Amino acid sequence: MEHFIEFRHVSKTYTMGEVKINALHDADFVIDEGELCVIVGPSGAGKTTLLNILGGMDTLTSGEVFVGGRDISHLGVKALTAYRRYEVGFVFQFYNLIQNLTALENVEMATHISHVETDAAEILAEVGLADRCRNFPAQLSGGEQQLVSIARALAKKPRLLLCDEPTGALDYVTGKQILRLLQDTARKTGMTVVIITHNSALTAMADRVVHVKNGTVERMECNPAAKPVDEIEW
């Protein structure tokens, strides 16, 4: 069976003057389509480097990365830009919203670069912000801003949603709301969702868990009994 995502012996080395930093070494893992995968590890483990390579925002030093059967590790600049634009949605810890645009306008920006027609207002309603769509980011809570960020990512109808510490700046209750939405997105749409976190408690919600430490993939686990977010405590 072909996996949707395959990392094959991926290494990444950064050079700073005469110093070489090995951010990743011989990383191997797979993710199937429609899974919610949690990549977990301490700060500096290499999680974000993995995410950046998977999202086409960084290149690898050696190895191969396949997404949907295509080797993205050797794409040219134009093809890699198209991959990021059309196939991947991004959600970050800090929401990166444009402050002088309303919530609706922030989401509409994503629809303008998508090759799939979507209704920004409808997507905001799906994440529970129908009555906040005319508000500016400064008028929204942190959780609401993150919901706008997720709506913006979903507006592109990506095959792959990448989330880097999506609850890191949020309180416990709001963080659970965000994680519930991400879990529901994978379950209901068949979208592949990847969450980067240092919080090992979140592994219970995942279909697949990739443990990263010191730039290596220590182990990968499948979880046939993923828990609903509401049943997880930390």
Predicted regions: what they are:
Residues 3-212:
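ABC family nucleotide-binding domain
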Residues 216-234:
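Conserved beta-strand-loop-alpha-helix hinge in the C-terminal portion
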